[in-house]
Amino acid sequence: MPHPPRICLACGRSFAWRKKWERDWENVKYCSNACKRSGEPGAEARRLERAILDLLDERARTATICPSEAARRVSPDDWRPLMEPVRRAARRLVADGRLEIVQGGRIVEPDHARGPIRLRRPR
């Protein structure tokens, strides 16, 4: 029986079963050692998720936001280092079914989104 893919708790990317996890697949939570070291999302990650959802709540149901808007909401003066954490937060929200990632007006899989993205509520 094939093993279904998992979603990394840290970065929100999907990952597939690997032979090295054969004995412990039920307990694997992270896609890589780097994500394992970073651990489960903390307070800042939750603030970013909340900022994304709050920004979308403030707009029309069909509106989109740029990830940089969420980063600026959390840290107005030093938002650039938060861009990758915002993308991670967005991927986790997609995994929860609370968000869609859009490029060029089309929904994209979080694992395949490269370059500029927009975030919106599911339709």
Regions found by a protein language model. Name each.
Residues 71-83:
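Short helix-coil junctions and helix-kink-helix linkers
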Residues 16, 36, 40:
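Short functional micro-motifs and their immediate structural scaffolds
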Residues 105-123:
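Short, cationic-aromatic polyanion-contact patches
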Residues 43-64:
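Positively charged, polyanion-binding regions of nucleic-acid-associated proteins
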Residues 95-103:
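A short, conserved structural fragment
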Residues 62-73:
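Short acidic, hydrophobic short linear motifs in intrinsically disordered regions
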Residues 8-11, 31:
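Short cysteine-rich clusters marking metal-coordination/redox-active sites
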Residues 19-28:
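Short linker/helix segments within small regulatory modules
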